[in-house]
A protein has these predicted regions:
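Glycine-enriched, solvent-exposed interface loops adjoining structured elements
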Residues: 1-148, 231-304
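Conserved, function-critical positions that sit in or immediately flank catalytic
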Residues: 148-231
């Protein structure tokens, strides 16, 4: 199931094409994805990256999409992988208290926010690297949503004559997609920043968006946002290709809640979602953790 099919199925099951409902389908889908990804570990949640440590620098920045560590290895000068053991910060500080305690790192700890970006994380290594070793991290992250054509970036034409303020949750108009809203900052009577609340769906690069003057203080003109990139132009994902019932019933549960539907319908779709999740869990934490050689073939007991 791709996003176009999922988008239509949600409308068909919910029997609604009301514009506000349709504009929020991408939100229903993203909420379902978040529930799935935080419940079952599946292959599409893992990513592998390599980087380089800085000699005499005990800190390592985590990838911007990092959620948690699967493994962290330092590659020695002869190509040998040395997998680091996860410890807490106190252990590393106590074991290697001096800046001169250098060598091939053996341990790592999730340290906290980076100095340059409070929203991103960093690791503490012990001992401090004595050379610029290559490091390989296998980690969990949120894969790209199945939502097709969500806004990613663009170029602002600020316009003139607007009332200075921060305008929240402003609907964006125009383009080939729908449903996008943003916080728009106006300074010096011109638009200076656009921060998405809802990235919408079905936009394409080259779309030119704007916003109603009525939503921007009632005065001013000529603000434009030219889309330069969107997310997932094909509207596909591993979940959509392999376990679409999880996405469908998860999104429908959110849709019924949005519609203020009857509690029994919420419970119905929740049950359907949980049944689908049992199948996915069988794969993610069952079949993929073993094989027939090690665990034997699955079979049922037959009475003689």
């Amino acid at each position: 199931m791709n996003y176009v099919q999922l988008y239509q199925a949600v409308q068909d099951y919910a029997e609604s094409t009301e514009q506000l409902f349709v504009d929020n389908i991408s939100t229903f889908v993203r909420q379902a994805e978040d529930r799935i990804y935080n419940t079952v570990q599946i292959p599409s949640l893992r990513r592998n990256v390599t980087g380089t440590l800085s000699a005499n620098n005990k800190y390592l920045s985590a990838p911007s999409d990092y959620l948690s560590t699967y493994s962290l290895a330092v590659i020695d000068t002869d190509g040998t992988y040395e997998y680091l053991l996860n410890k807490d910060v106190n252990f590393i500080r106590q074991a290697y208290p001096q800046p001169t305690d250098t060598g091939l790192p053996r341990y790592y700890a999730l340290f906290g926010s980076q100095y340059t970006d409070a929203n991103e994380l960093s690791f503490l290594l012990g001992p401090t690297p004595d050379s610029s070793y290559t490091v390989e991290m296998h980690y969990f992250y949120y894969p790209t949503s199945i939502v097709q054509g969500a806004l990613s970036s663009g170029i602002i034409t600020g316009g003139t004559g607007y009332a200075n303020n921060l305008y929240s949750n402003v609907p964006l108009t125009g383009g080939s997609g729908s449903g996008a809203t943003a916080n728009i900052t106006i300074a010096g009577n011109t638009v200076t920043s656009v921060t998405f609340n809802n990235k919408g769906n079905f936009y394409v690069a080259g779309d030119v968006l704007s916003a109603s003057t009525a939503d921007l203080g009632g005065i001013g003109s000529s603000f434009l946002f030219t889309v330069t990139a969107v997310e997932n132009t094909l509207g596909t994902s591993w979940l959509g290709d392999n376990y679409d019932p999880c996405l469908l019933y998860g999104a429908l549960r959110e849709a019924v809640i949005f519609q203020k539907g009857e509690q029994d319908m919420v419970q119905y779709y929740e049950k359907q979602f949980q049944d689908a999740m049992m199948q996915l869990n069988r794969l993610g934490t069952g079949l993929e953790r073993g094989d027939a050689y090690r665990d034997g073939q699955a079979r049922i007991k037959v009475n003689p």
